[in-house]
Amino acid sequence: MRAIGIRSTPKGGFGNRLLNYINLRELSSLFGVPWFGPNVGDRRLVRGIHRPRRWPEALLQPVFFDREEILEEEFLERASDVLSNRRSVIMKPRLLTEALARFDFLPPRQLVRHRFSICGSHRRQHGKEAPIVLHLRGTDFATWQPGAVLEESFYRNALDLLAEQGLQDAAVRICTDDPEHPALEGLSMDLRRTGRLLEGPCDNPFQCDFAAMAQAQTVVSSPSTFAITAALVGHSSAIHSRKWIDSRIQKGDLFWRKIRNRTLRGHRLFAEV
């Protein structure tokens, strides 16, 4: 049985899970074989994440690949050999940015389409959504990677750059999962003072924030997979931290190198600041 898939749901939030699905769809399309994976609720939020078929292991005759093997240069050739022998490929489930950098054969928005929409409260309050969204990611990021919680100066520099492009009066929305983010208070105060901040109660922050980032003209982005995937399946361009990209490239991170070089399919880099 020729197929490719994962056995268990990956750890982490929605962005991590969506990256796994995108990578599965990329490889399924490349090899022309069905994909399979755990049946989770994300399929109600994203078109293309359908209920995967389930086959008995005896029929699959699987060959297992761990994360290190998936990232090796020889992986695609080895996987092709397995599939040509009518066996299946089963991968460890953390197929995140490093895998997408290797398997971005098609733009993600060709493979999946999100069903997220701006909540009713925001539509009633503001009528239209902000062209600029700031994504502030905090919480566990402080312990995940030094420098991953971006400084307030990054967001201010990005807003200054957008002002030079004629967006000095454009409305701004702040999306964050962390009310204690060190940049939140200062940014909110200044944007509120100038009448640019879109704020108010939200019916469903998770879905509404994702929709806002996917629909925005520009997202001033954290390194979060939640923000990155919104840009990949949406229509926004992104401003990223030059300091963050430098640090990741120094560690050999192909994903961020491709973002800098504007060679990651489906990603639109507006600028680094």
Which role does the model predict for each range below?
Residues 5-6, 34-40, 133-135, 173-175, ...:
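A structural signal for short, well-ordered beta-strand segments and their strand-loop junctions
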Residues 18-28, 155-163:
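Histidine-anchored nucleotide/phosphate-binding helix
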